[in-house]
């Protein structure tokens, strides 16, 4: 496309869109009435419960239900008469006033008490800053199948309310509309399985799959919110352009830009705690996409036939459209054109956005992070070359310079999937744990174990996929998990190597972590026998908790001996596994642990000497 024609098209479509999909608030006297009517009472209540649970993570379900009931009754009255008292107040004002009026708020949430002295929007910003990514809450344990089904059948609404509350307060940035979708799926599973002859056999695999989906969704949304907060809307919009260009390669750049702008607004609203607006605008975006399928994708119809929640989620996960068969070589517009520097100088964001769009739609097999790194490399090359006497001679081989950037994640995927296939998930997690403990031994052992277990699941998520889907799956998943590592590390920074990777560009973060060497500045921990002393209770732990106990011991061994070889660690952990198996078979298990434990510790010290 000729550049002048393209700029004109973008200007016209952009101007039209500025009056577009989401510009509706002025027509409503009452924002809360508007959202209540749009969403319906069921979803309105769910989102209000979720909002309060995200902000007040220590409150009980019963306390939140009382707040939800009061807000819903108020919204219902405003829907009947939008000019009624206080109905014209903003949602931030209404919700903030409700939080600050709670009895004993200052005692229970002393760290947030100062927020209530502020005015909007500073008050809401203050509440957001106090969301805790790692709240000190007990692990959420699933009830036995019979007890679960009894509670669900006695009061399905209360049962699902508890589910929303518990997920929300543990994941204060979870994407609100998606949590409602998962709650609906949860309800469907319980309805089906509680009528089955073997409730447990029906429930366990289905609920395990939903839990895994929720955990992955939580870290992915947290990455989006981190990106938005740290680098602003422009960075997120670039992510959205790349992602949507891959999914909708037949849509033109103006359409992709429009969709990316909308998605950025929706994501910003959810990250900002504006869940009612976020859910409402997400539904509006889905409506727009379904009304404009012809200009977006041929794969949308099945999604568009679904009801609101399912429709939006289906569109978010829709398969890639078929790539156009006649796409010209990219070099024509971005390398060979004599006006490359002129076009870049006249409209940098548009020119780079077009490059990202064109490159992304041709490479659905790349991760979004990789595509953004390539765009960053292209931008840096133009910045350098367009200032030189012969720009084309300078940037003429820029596409050749992309090769090492592409090969690095491809090699990462190949080597890690081969290791996963050889070791299985648990063995692969252990390999990752050793690798990252050596890179950042100062990080707390629980954080290292959590990170390694999450990073290790990348094999299960991605390595069985077709080759063309592996790279985007692996790198985008790793980026989300490493973002959580960074968030936890920011609270108590202990490793300069981790700080270096976490403080840089988001798209460079995964390569930075992958390239980290063993931390040679680390002074090994003193060997303490009590760290490796176990008791009979380990024998009755669920398999997951037993694995975590063993992984904790493994991390501590590496911290004691960072230079330990793979063979040394394998020998020690093999002896440890035999020790557990032997003692857990004994009638007097504790006596076995007391007798054999010190021997194991002595042998381990000797093996690592």
Swiss-Prot record:
Keywords: Calcium, Cleavage on pair of basic residues, Copper, Disulfide bond, Lipid-binding, Metal-binding, Methylation, Phosphoprotein, Repeat, Secreted, Signal, Zinc. It comes from Meriones unguiculatus (Mongolian jird). Coiled coil: none annotated. PANTHER family: ALBUMIN (PTHR11385:SF15), SERUM ALBUMIN-RELATED (PTHR11385). The lineage of its organism: Eukaryota, Metazoa, Chordata, Craniata, Vertebrata. The modification Phosphothreonine is found at residues 445, 447. This is Albumin. One of its GO terms (molecular function) is enterobactin binding. Residues 19-24 form a propeptide. PROSITE patterns: ALBUMIN_1, ALBUMIN_2. Interacts with FCGRT; this interaction regulates ALB homeostasis. Interacts with TASOR. In plasma, occurs in a covalently-linked complex with chromophore-bound alpha-1-microglobulin; this interaction does not prevent fatty acid binding to ALB. Disulfide bonds join 78-87, 100-116, 115-126, 149-194, 193-202, 225-271, 270-278, 290-304, 303-314, 341-386, 385-394, 417-463, 462-473, 486-502, 501-512, 539-584, 583-592. The modification N6-succinyllysine is found at residues 230, 544, 589. Plasma. Phosphorylated by FAM20C in the extracellular medium. Zn(2+) binds at residues 92, 272, 274. Ca(2+) 1 binds at residues 31, 269, 274, 277. GO terms for cellular component: blood microparticle; cytoplasm; protein-containing complex. The modification N6-methyllysine is found at residue 559. Belongs to the ALB/AFP/VDB family. The modification Phosphoserine is found at residues 30, 83, 90, 298, 444, 514. It is found in: Secreted.
């Amino acid at each position: 496309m000729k550049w002048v024609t393209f700029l004109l098209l973008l200007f016209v479509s952009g101007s039209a869109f500025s009056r577009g999909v989401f510009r509706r608030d002025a027509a409503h006297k009452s924002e809360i009435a508007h959202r209540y009517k749009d969403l319906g009472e069921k979803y309105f209540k769910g989102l209000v419960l979720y909002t309060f649970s995200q902000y007040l993570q220590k409150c009980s379900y019963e306390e939140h239900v009382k707040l939800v009931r009061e807000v819903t009754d108020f919204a219902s009255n405003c829907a009947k008469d939008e000019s009624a008292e206080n109905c014209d107040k903003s949602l931030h004002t209404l919700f903030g006033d409700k939080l600050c009026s709670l009895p004993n708020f200052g005692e229970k949430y002393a760290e947030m008490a100062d927020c209530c002295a502020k005015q909007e929007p500073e008050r809401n910003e203050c509440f957001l800053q106090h969301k805790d990514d790692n709240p000190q809450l007990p692990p959420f344990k699933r009830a036995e199948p019979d007890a679960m089904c009894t509670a669900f059948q006695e009061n399905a609404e209360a049962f699902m309310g508890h589910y929303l509350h518990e997920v929300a307060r543990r994941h204060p940035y979870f994407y609100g509309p998606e949590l409602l979708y998962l709650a609906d799926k949860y309800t469907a599973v319980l309805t089906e399985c509680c009528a089955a002859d073997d409730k447990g056999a029906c429930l366990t695999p289905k609920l395990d799959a939903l839990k895994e989906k929720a955990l992955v969704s939580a870290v992915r949304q947290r990455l989006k919110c981190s990106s938005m907060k740290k680098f602003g809307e422009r960075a997120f919009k670039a992510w959205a352009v790349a992602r949507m260009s891959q999914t909708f390669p037949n849509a033109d750049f103006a359409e992709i830009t429009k969709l990316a702008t909308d998605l950025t607004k929706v994501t910003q609203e959810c990250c900002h705690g504006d869940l009612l607006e976020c859910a409402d605008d997400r539904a509006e975006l889905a409506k727009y996409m379904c009304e404009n399928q012809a200009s977006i994708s041929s794969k949308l119809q099945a999604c568009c036939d679904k009801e609101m929640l399912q429709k939006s989620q289906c569109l978010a996960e829709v398969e890639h459209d078929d790539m156009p068969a006649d796409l010209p070589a990219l070099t024509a517009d971005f390398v060979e054109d004599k006006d490359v520097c002129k076009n870049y100088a006249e409209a940098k964001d548009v020119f780079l956005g077009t490059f990202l769009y064109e490159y992304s739609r041709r490479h659905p097999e790349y991760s979004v992070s990789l595509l953004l790194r390539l765009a960053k490399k292209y931008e840096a090359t133009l910045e350098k070359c367009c200032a030189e006497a012969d720009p084309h001679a300078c940037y003429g081989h820029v596409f050749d310079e992309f090769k090492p950037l592409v090969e690095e994640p491809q090699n990462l995927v190949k080597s890690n999937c081969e290791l996963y296939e050889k070791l299985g998930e648990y063995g692969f997690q252990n390999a990752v744990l050793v690798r990252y403990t050596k890179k950042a031994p100062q990080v707390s052992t629980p954080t290292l174990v959590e990170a390694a277990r999450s990073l290790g699941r990348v094999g299960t998520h991605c390595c069985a996929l077709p080759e063309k889907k592996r790279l985007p799956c692996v790198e985008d998943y790793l980026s989300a998990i490493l973002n959580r590592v960074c968030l936890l590390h920011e609270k108590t920074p202990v490793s300069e190597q981790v700080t270096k990777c976490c403080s840089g560009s988001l798209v460079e973060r995964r390569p930075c972590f992958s390239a980290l060497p063993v931390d040679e500045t680390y002074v090994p921990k003193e060997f303490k026998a009590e760290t490796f002393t176990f008791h009979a209770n380990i024998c009755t732990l669920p398999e997951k908790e037993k694995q975590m106990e063993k992984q904790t011991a493994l991390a501590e061994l590496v911290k004691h001996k960072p230079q330990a070889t793979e063979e040394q660690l394998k020998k020690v952990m093999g002896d440890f596994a035999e020790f557990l198996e032997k003692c857990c078979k004994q009638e007097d298990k504790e006596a076995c642990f007391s007798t054999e434990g010190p021997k194991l510790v002595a042998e381990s010290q000797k093996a690592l000497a």
